[in-house]
Amino acid sequence: MSPAAGVPEMPALDASGVRLGIVASTWHSRICDALLAGARKVAADSGVDNPTVVRVLGAIEIPVVAQELARNHDAVVALGVVIRGQTPHFEYVCDAVTQGITRVSLDASTPVANGVLTTDNEQQALDRAGLPESAEDKGSQAAGAALSAALTLRELRARS
């Protein structure tokens, strides 16, 4: 899988000692399981041995579980997929999840990386899921972003 246009190369991270929480939905299980596998691989490659993994039914449940994980973790990864349908439900769910994840991150001063795919169709989600035939791996990218932000915050807080 070659990097998509505009996606930065993730540097190798030494995140040993970082407490990582991952919340992943179960709707569209093939996609969410692949996102989770990508996040776990980045965590392991970065020295995070046992991230806390919590599965929830749908994307709308992600923010409240991310909030709980943020209480005792240094970083959180939120993974899921919302695929556009024929009703405005897509917009409501996407907005609520995105705003919820952002609020949790700011309120807890803990990075919560948004790896929730919001796509027009299932193929777009599959293309981003980190499967062998996928163009991108948003689970890996989200985990890398969360760990990188946690290390940056650790460094900034050590200066205070």
Curated annotation (Swiss-Prot):
GO biological process, one term: riboflavin biosynthetic process
Catalytic EC class: transferase
Binding residues for 5-amino-6-(D-ribitylamino)uracil: 27, 59-61, 81-83, 114
InterPro entries in the cross-refs: LS, LS/RS, LS/RS_sf
Pfam families, per the entry: DMRL_synthase
Annotated catalytic residues: 89
A molecular-function term among this protein's GO annotations: 6,7-dimethyl-8-ribityllumazine synthase activity
Recorded catalytic activity of this chain's protein: (2S)-2-hydroxy-3-oxobutyl phosphate + 5-amino-6-(D-ribitylamino)uracil = 6,7-dimethyl-8-(1-D-ribityl)lumazine + phosphate + 2 H2O + H(+)
CDD domains per record: Lumazine_synthase-I
GO CC, alphabetical: cytosol; riboflavin synthase complex
Pathway: Cofactor biosynthesis; riboflavin biosynthesis; riboflavin from 2-hydroxy-3-oxobutyl phosphate and 5-amino-6-(D-ribitylamino)uracil: step 1/2
Disulfide bonds: none
EC number(s) reported in the record: 2.5.1.78
Binding site for (2S)-2-hydroxy-3-oxobutyl phosphate: 86-87, 128
UniProt keyword list: Riboflavin biosynthesis, Transferase
Assembly and binders: Homopentamer.
Family: Belongs to the DMRL synthase family.
HAMAP family from the UniProt entry: Lumazine_synth (MF_00178)
Function field: Catalyzes the formation of 6,7-dimethyl-8-ribityllumazine by condensation of 5-amino-6-(D-ribitylamino)uracil with 3,4-dihydroxy-2-butanone 4-phosphate. This is the penultimate step in the biosynthesis of riboflavin.
Protein name: 6,7-dimethyl-8-ribityllumazine synthase
Organism from which the protein derives: Mycolicibacterium paratuberculosis (strain ATCC BAA-968 / K-10)
Lineage of the species this protein comes from: Bacteria, Bacillati, Actinomycetota, Actinomycetes, Mycobacteriales
